[in-house]
C-alpha cells in the first residue's frame, strides 16, 4: 500500500518537473535542464544548478568507509560534498533523523522487544516515508575493548554515539536478526531532556528510554572539545572538532589533539576499527577509477529505477540524484537549515574571477572521449559524452523562455507616500527575463574560445587597466553640480553647505573609513555615477571625522531623514540593491557613535531590518536576475575579462557587506552592551574577503592575480570563514595542551612554562585586513553563544571535565586565550598602522601623478587623513580589549555601580543597586576575573595615553574626542575608565572624605514612586543650597593626591604587559599582573583620573559622550566622599 503511495507521489513530482504542453506550470516561470535527454524543469535557478551536477559533476566524492561486515570499502560516489558528509554520518551512526522509540510505541509494535535487549542509542533507525515503515535496528554483537576505544577517533560532542563500558556477552546474532525484523512507526522523537544532543552514554546507569551522562567521567580532554562542538553544533551543516587521543596511556598532558576543522572540508579517513581484520589500509581511488566508477553507477542507476525513486523521495535536492545514499534525508533539520541559510555558499555564486582564472590557467581542453577511450569506462548503452559535456567541464548556459511569451504585470505592493511611486521589483524581475534570454543566446553562439591562442590574447588584454576603472583621484570625491542637485532634492539643508565642504567630506571617507574595512571598490568608483543615497551616506560618514562643526552642518542634516529616504525608495523593496544596504550600514554606524540617544537606540532597533534585507539579496537568495549560469569550467565560460571583473566586483562587494553586517552585529554588541545577536558565527559560510592588494589595485593582470592565488584550485578550499575560525580554535587548544598552561602557576612568581610548539601551528597568511577582523568577530560570536548556554543545566552538566578541569581553565579562559592568539598570530598588532589599515601602493603612484590637480582643489591630505596621523602607539582595534572585559563582567553592573540611574530604559531601585554592589565587590576581589579585567582595561589606557620617547614613558593628554577616526574608541575609553574606578572604589572606598552628606540619605537616593527614574533630590531650602554650594566649591578647589599622569605612569610601571611577547608568555604575564594588582597600594587615588575623563567627555559633540562626562563627575564626587551613588542628571544633556 505504501509502495503505491510512494510511486504515485514520484509520478506526480515527475509530472511537475516535466516540460510538456499539459504542464500546469508556465514555462516562462521555470528553468529547464539543458541536457539534451533531460526534460526536467525547476522553479528556482539554484535547484537547476544542483540538478545539473547529476549530468556534469565537477568532482566525484567517494565514501572511504570500510564496512565491518564484509571488510570492503563502501566506495559509494556522490556529486556533492554535503551528500557525502550526510552519507558518512550514517556509517558513524550519528545525527539520525529518528530517535529512540517510546515505551508505548515499543510495546505496540513488539511486546517481546523489552525482553530481548534494552534500547541502545547506537541503533540506526531507517525510514523512507511517513507512516509505518520497516526500521532495521543494527546492533554490534561484540563491543570494542576499552583499549581500542581509547585509540579510536572521538566523534564530535553533539554527534556522540553510545559506547558501552562493559561487554555484554549475552547479545547473540540471533537476537540481532530478531531486531532487524521489528517494525515501528516513523514518528519517533528524541526525549525532551536531550535536544540536539547525541553523546556517549552508559547503559548500566541509564534507563532504556532516557540515557544519562555522568559528568565525573573524563576522557582526556574530550569535554574540552565538547564545549566547542556546542558552538559549532551542525545546525548549519558544519561539524565541530574531532579529537585524536592516540597512545595517551592516561596522561592528558602528553596527549596530542588533532582537531579537524569543518568536516565539510575533509572526509573521514584513517579510521581505526575494533577488530584487527579491519585494520587493512584503504587504497584511495585514482582519478580514472573514480570516473570509471561514476559511469558504472550511472548505468546501475538506470537499471534500478525503483531504488532511484526511493533515493529521490528521501533526497529532495537534487531531484533524481542517482548517486544519493538511501539512508540520507534532506528532511533533517540540520541539513535543511543549510539550504535555508542565506549566508552560506550554497546560495552565493562562486567567485567569478577565481573561476575565470582557473580556466585561463589550465591546459587546452581535451575531449573526454579521447582521454578515456582506451579504458572502456563508458558503458555500451551510455551515450558518448560530447566535448562540451566533459567530466570536468559541464555546459554552462540554460535555456530561457521565448520572446513572444506575455508576462503579466504585477500590481505595486507598497506605497510609502502617495506622492511617491515605489516600483514593484517582482515585475521588474519578470520583465528582465527576456533580456537574460537574449544575453544567453548571444553567449551560446560563441565559438570555441578555449584554444591556446585565444587564451594568450586574453592574458595579454588583462595587462591594461579595465575601461570602467577610474584612476583619477578626483573621481572619488569631486562631485559635480548636477549630482549635488540630485542630493539636494533629498536633503534641502545641504544647499547651504559649500561645495568644498562636500568634497572634503567625501575625501575624508576615503582616507579615514575606507582603509579600515574596504567596503567599496575604490578603483571602479566614480562619484558622479553613484546613486544619490550612497553619496549622501559617504558624505555623512566622512564629515563625522572632521569635528563637531562638520557633524552639525553636514552629518546631522543628512542622518535624520536619510533612513526614511532609504525606506521609502523603490530599491529598498527586497531584493534590495547593494548600495541600499551599504547606505543603511553607514547610517547605523553614525547613529550609534555620533548622534543623540534617540538615534542611538533607533539604530539598534533597525539593525534587524538591515540583516533581513541582506538575507534577501540577489546573490544570497537566488534571485533570478542574477545570472547563475554555473560557468565554472567549460569552453563557453571563457569570456571578456571586463565582464568577469564587473561580476567579480559585485560578488566581492556583496560578500564584504555581509561580513560588515556580521562584524557590526558582534563588535557593537560588545562595545555598547547589546546581547542579542542577529547572526551567529556558524551561519557565516562565506569565503574570506580577497587580498587587499587585489581589491584596491588598478592592476588586474594575469600575472598579478596568479601571484595572489587566483587560478589555483586550492584557494577556495581553505579560505572559508568558518574553516579559518575552526582552525584558529584548533591551534588554541593545541597550544594550551602542549604548553600545559595553568592560571594558578602565576602564584609561584610568574611564568614557569617555556612556550613550545608555537611554530607548528598554522602560519596565518590572510591578506585582507577586514578578513582578519572577521575572525575576531567570530570569536566574539562564540562568546555570546557560550553566555547564552552557561545558565542552563545543559551547559553546566556537560562541560565540567576534560581540558577545562584538567588544565585548570574555564571556557572563558580558553576564549580569552583565543583572543590573545588572534591578536598576536593573526592580526599581529592592534597599534601598528601598517597592520591596522589597508595600504594601496598602486594608488600612491597614481596620486603622485595627479598631485597638481589635487593641490588645485585646495584639499590637503595631511589635514584630513586622521587615521594616518593617529599616534602609532594608539590602539586601533579597541574591541579586542573590551571583549576581554565582557568575557568576565557585563557593562550593566559597573555602569549602574558608577551611578547611572537606569540602563536599557529600566530604572534602578535600592535593592537592585545593593545586589549589584555585592556583585562588583565579589568580582573585584577575584584576581582571575576582576583582576584580569582591570589589567586588560589598563593595557588599553596605556596604549591610548602613553608613548615612549627614548624608552621613557610619557603621558599624552591631547585627545580630541570629536575627531577620532576609530568610531568605537571613545566609548571604549569611557568603559575601561569606569571599570577601573568601580573595582578600586568597591575595594578601597573614596580617596578623601571632604563631602558634606548632611542632607543626603540612602532613602533619598532612590525614589520608588518615580517611575521615570528621575530621582532628583528636592533640597531647595536655604540650608540645602548652602551645603550644595559648599560641596561644589570643595570639588572645584580640590587638588588630587595623584594627577592622571602620575597615577597612569605608576600603574604602567606595575601592570604593563609587553605586547611583543609571544602569546603564551603574554597570557601568563597577564595572570601574573592580575595577581600582583592586589598588592599595589593606593589604587583608589582616582580623583585626578576622573577629572581628566570628565573634561574630555564634556567636550564631546556626541550626546552619549556628554552623558559619560556627567557620570565621571559623579564618580569624582563619590571619590571625595559623597554617599549618594546615583547621578540624577546624567541624561540631561
Swiss-Prot record:
Residues 414-432 have a biased composition (Polar residues). Keywords: Cytoplasm, Metal-binding, Nucleus, Repeat, Zinc, Zinc-finger. Disulfide bonds: none annotated. Its main location: cytoplasm. Residues 1-34, 90-130, 195-225, 283-334, 371-451 are annotated as: Disordered. Residues 18-27, 195-205, 283-316 have a biased composition (Low complexity). InterPro entries: Transcription_factor_dom_fun (IPR007219), VerF-like (IPR051059), Znf_C2H2_sf (IPR036236), Znf_C2H2_type (IPR013087). It is found in: Cytoplasm; Nucleus. A zinc finger (C2H2-type) spans 31-55, 61-91. GO terms for molecular function: DNA-binding transcription factor activity, RNA polymerase II-specific; RNA polymerase II cis-regulatory region sequence-specific DNA binding; sequence-specific DNA binding; zinc ion binding. SUPFAM superfamilies: beta-beta-alpha zinc fingers. GO terms for cellular component: chromatin; cytoplasm; nucleus. GO terms for biological process: DNA-templated transcription; regulation of transcription by RNA polymerase II. The keyword Chloroplast does not apply. CDD domains: fungal_TF_MHR (cd12148). Residues 90-100 have a biased composition (Basic residues). It holds the Pfam family zf-C2H2. Residues 1-16 have a biased composition (Basic and acidic residues). Present with 238 molecules/cell in log phase SD medium. This is Zinc finger protein YPR022C. It comes from Saccharomyces cerevisiae (strain ATCC 204508 / S288c) (Baker's yeast).
Amino acid at each position: 500500500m505504501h509502495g503505491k503511495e510512494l510511486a504515485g507521489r514520484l509520478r506526480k513530482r515527475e509530472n511537475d518537473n516535466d516540460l510538456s504542453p499539459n504542464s500546469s506550470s508556465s514555462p516562462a516561470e521555470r528553468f529547464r535542464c539543458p541536457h539534451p535527454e533531460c526534460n526536467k524543469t525547476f522553479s528556482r535557478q539554484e535547484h537547476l544548478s544542483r540538478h545539473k551536477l547529476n549530468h556534469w559533476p565537477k568532482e566525484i566524492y567517494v565514501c572511504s568507509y570500510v564496512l565491518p561486515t564484509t571488510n570492503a570499502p563502501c566506495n559509494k560516489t556522490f556529486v556533492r560534498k554535503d551528500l557525502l558528509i550526510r552519507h558518512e554520518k550514517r556509517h558513524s551512526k550519528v545525527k539520525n533523523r529518528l530517535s529512540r522509540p517510546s515505551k508505548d510505541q515499543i510495546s505496540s509494535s513488539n511486546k517481546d522487544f523489552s525482553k530481548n535487549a534494552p534500547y541502545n542509542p547506537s541503533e540506526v533507525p531507517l525510514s523512507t516515508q511517513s507512516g509505518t515503515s520497516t526500521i532495521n535496528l543494527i546492533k554490534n554483537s561484540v563491543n570494542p575493548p576499552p583499549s581500542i576505544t581509547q585509540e579510536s577517533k572521538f566523534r564530535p560532542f553533539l554527534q556522540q554515539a553510545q559506547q558501552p563500558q562493559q561487554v555484554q556477552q549475552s547479545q547473540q546474532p540471533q537476537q540481532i536478526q530478531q531486531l532487524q525484523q521489528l517494525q515501528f512507526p516513523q514518528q519517533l522523537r528524541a526525549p525532551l531532556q536531550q535536544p540536539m544532543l547525541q553523546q556517549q552514554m552508559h547503559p548500566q546507569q541509564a534507563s532504556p528510554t532516557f540515557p544519562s551522562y555522568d559528568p565525573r567521567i573524563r576522557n582526556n580532554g574530550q569535554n574540552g572539545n565538547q564545549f566547542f562542538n556546542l558552538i559549532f553544533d551542525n545546525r548549519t551543516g558544519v561539524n565541530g572538532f574531532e579529537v585524536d587521543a592516540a597512545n595517551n596511556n592516561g596522561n592528558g598532558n602528553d596527549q596530542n589533539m588533532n582537531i579537524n576543522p569543518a568536516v565539510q572540508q575533509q572526509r573521514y579517513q584513517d579510521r581505526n576499527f575494533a577488530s584487527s581484520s579491519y585494520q587493512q589500509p584503504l587504497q584511495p581511488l585514482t582519478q580514472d577509477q573514480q570516473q570509471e566508477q561514476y559511469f558504472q553507477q550511472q548505468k546501475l542507476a538506470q537499471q534500478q529505477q525503483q531504488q532511484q525513486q526511493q533515493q529521490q523521495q528521501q533526497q529532495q535536492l537534487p531531484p533524481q540524484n542517482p548517486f544519493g545514499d538511501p539512508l540520507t534525508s534532506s528532511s533533517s533539520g540540520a541539513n535543511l537549515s543549510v539550504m535555508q541559510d542565506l549566508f552560506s555558499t550554497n546560495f552565493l555564486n562562486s567567485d567569478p574571477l577565481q573561476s575565470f582564472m582557473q580556466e585561463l590557467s589550465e591546459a587546452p581542453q581535451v575531449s573526454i572521449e579521447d582521454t578515456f577511450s582506451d579504458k572502456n569506462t563508458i558503458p555500451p548503452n551510455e551515450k558518448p559524452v560530447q566535448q562540451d559535456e566533459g567530466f570536468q567541464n559541464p555546459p554552462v548556459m540554460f535555456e530561457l523562455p521565448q520572446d513572444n511569451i506575455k508576462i503579466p504585470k504585477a500590481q505595486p505592493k507598497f506605497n510609502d507616500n502617495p506622492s511617491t511611486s515605489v516600483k514593484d521589483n517582482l515585475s521588474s524581475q519578470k520583465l528582465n527575463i527576456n533580456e537574460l534570454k537574449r544575453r544567453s543566446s548571444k553567449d551560446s553562439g560563441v565559438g570555441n574560445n578555449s584554444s591556446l591562442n585565444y587564451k594568450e590574447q586574453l592574458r595579454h588584454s588583462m595587462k591594461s587597466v579595465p575601461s570602467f576603472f577610474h584612476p583619477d583621484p578626483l573621481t572619488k570625491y569631486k562631485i559635480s553640480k548636477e549630482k549635488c542637485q540630485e542630493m539636494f532634492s533629498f536633503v534641502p539643508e545641504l544647499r547651504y553647505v559649500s561645495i568644498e565642504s562636500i568634497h572634503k567630506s567625501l575625501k575624508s571617507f576615503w582616507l579615514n573609513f575606507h582603509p579600515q574595512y574596504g567596503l567599496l571598490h575604490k578603483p571602479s568608483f566614480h562619484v558622479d555615477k553613484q546613486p544619490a543615497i550612497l553619496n549622501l551616506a559617504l558624505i555623512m560618514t566622512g564629515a563625522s571625522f572632521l569635528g563637531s562643526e562638520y557633524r552639525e552642518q553636514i552629518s546631522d542634516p543628512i542622518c535624520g531623514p536619510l533612513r526614511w529616504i532609504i525606506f521609502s525608495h523603490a530599491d529598498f523593496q527586497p531584493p534590495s540593491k547593494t548600495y541600499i544596504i551599504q547606505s543603511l550600514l553607514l547610517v547605523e554606524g553614525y547613529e550609534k557613535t555620533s548622534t543623540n540617544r534617540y538615534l542611538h537606540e533607533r539604530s539598534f532597533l533597525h539593525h534587524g531590518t538591515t540583516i533581513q534585507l541582506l538575507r534577501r539579496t540577489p546573490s544570497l537568495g537566488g534571485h533570478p536576475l542574477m545570472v547563475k549560469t554555473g560557468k565554472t569550467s567549460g569552453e563557453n565560460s571563457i569570456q571578456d575579462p571586463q565582464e568577469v571583473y564587473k561580476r567579480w566586483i559585485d560578488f566581492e562587494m556583496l560578500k564584504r557587506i555581509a561580513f560588515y553586517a556580521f562584524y557590526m552585529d558582534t563588535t557593537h554588541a560588545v562595545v555598547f552592551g547589546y546581547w542579542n545577536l542577529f547572526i551567529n558565527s556558524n551561519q557565516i559560510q562565506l569565503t574570506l574577503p580577497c587580498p587587499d592588494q587585489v581589491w584596491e589595485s588598478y592592476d588586474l593582470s594575469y600575472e598579478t592575480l596568479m601571484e595572489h592565488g587566483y587560478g589555483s584550485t586550492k584557494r577556495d578550499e581553505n579560505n572559508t570563514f568558518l574553516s579559518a575560525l575552526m582552525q584558529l580554535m584548533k591551534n588554541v587548544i593545541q597550544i594550551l595542551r602542549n604548553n600545559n598552561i595553568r592560571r594558578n602557576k602565576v602564584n609561584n612568581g610568574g611564568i614557569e612554562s617555556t612556550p613550545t610548539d608555537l611554530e607548528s601551528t598554522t602560519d596565518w597568511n590572510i591578506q585582507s585586513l577586514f578578513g582578519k577582523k572577521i575572525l575576531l568577530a567570530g570569536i566574539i560570536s562564540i562568546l555570546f553563544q557560550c553566555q547564552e548556554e552557561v545558565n542552563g543545566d545543559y551547559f553546566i552538566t556537560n562541560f565540567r571535565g576534560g581540558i577545562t578541569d584538567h588544565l585548570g581553565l574555564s571556557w572563558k579562559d580558553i576564549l580569552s586565550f583565543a583572543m590573545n592568539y588572534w591578536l598576536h598570530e593573526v592580526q599581529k598588532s592592534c597599534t601598528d598602522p601598517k597592520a591596522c589599515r589597508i595600504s594601496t601602493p598602486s594608488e600612491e603612484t597614481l596620486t603622485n601623478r595627479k598631485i597638481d590637480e589635487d593641490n588645485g582643489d585646495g584639499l590637503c591630505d595631511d589635514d584630513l587623513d586622521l587615521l594616518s596621523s593617529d599616534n602609532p602607539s594608539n590602539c586601533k582595534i579597541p574591541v579586542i580589549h573590551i571583549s576581554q572585559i565582557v568575557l568576565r563582567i557585563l557593562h550593566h553592573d559597573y555602569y549602574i555601580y558608577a551611578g547611572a540611574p537606569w540602563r536599557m530604559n529600566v530604572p534602578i531601585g535600592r535593592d537592585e543597586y545593593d545586589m549589584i554592589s555585592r556583585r562588583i565587590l565579589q568580582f573585584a576581589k577575584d584576581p582571575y576575573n576582576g583582576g584580569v579585567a582591570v589589567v586588560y582595561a589598563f593595557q588599553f589606557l596605556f596604549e591610548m595615553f602613553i608613548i615612549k620617547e627614548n624608552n621613557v614613558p610619557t603621558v599624552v593628554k591631547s585627545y580630541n574626542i570629536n575627531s577620532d577616526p576609530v568610531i568605537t574608541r571613545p566609548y571604549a575609553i569611557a568603559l575601561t575608565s569606569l571599570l577601573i574606578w568601580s573595582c578600586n572604589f568597591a575595594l578601597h572606598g573614596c580617596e578623601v572624605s571632604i563631602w558634606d552628606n548632611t542632607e543626603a540619605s540612602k532613602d533619598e537616593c532612590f525614589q520608588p514612586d518615580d517611575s521615570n527614574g528621575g530621582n532628583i533630590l528636592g533640597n531647595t531650602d536655604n540650608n540645602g543650597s548652602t551645603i550644595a554650594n559648599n560641596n561644589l566649591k570643595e570639588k572645584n578647589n580640590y587638588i588630587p593626591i595623584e594627577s592622571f599622569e602620575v597615577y597612569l605612569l605608576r600603574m604602567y610601571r606595575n601592570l604593563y604587559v609587553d605586547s611583543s611577547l609571544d602569546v603564551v608568555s603574554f597570557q601568563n604575564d597577564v595572570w601574573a599582573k592580575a595577581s600582583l594588582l592586589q598588592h599595589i597600594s593606593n589604587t583608589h587615588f582616582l580623583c585626578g583620573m576622573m577629572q581628566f575623563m570628565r573634561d574630555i567627555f564634556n567636550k564631546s559633540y556626541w550626546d552619549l559622550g556628554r552623558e559619560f562626562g556627567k557620570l565621571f563627575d559623579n564618580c569624582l564626587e563619590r571619590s571625595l566622599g559623597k554617599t549618594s551613588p546615583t547621578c540624577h542628571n546624567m541624561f540631561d544633556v
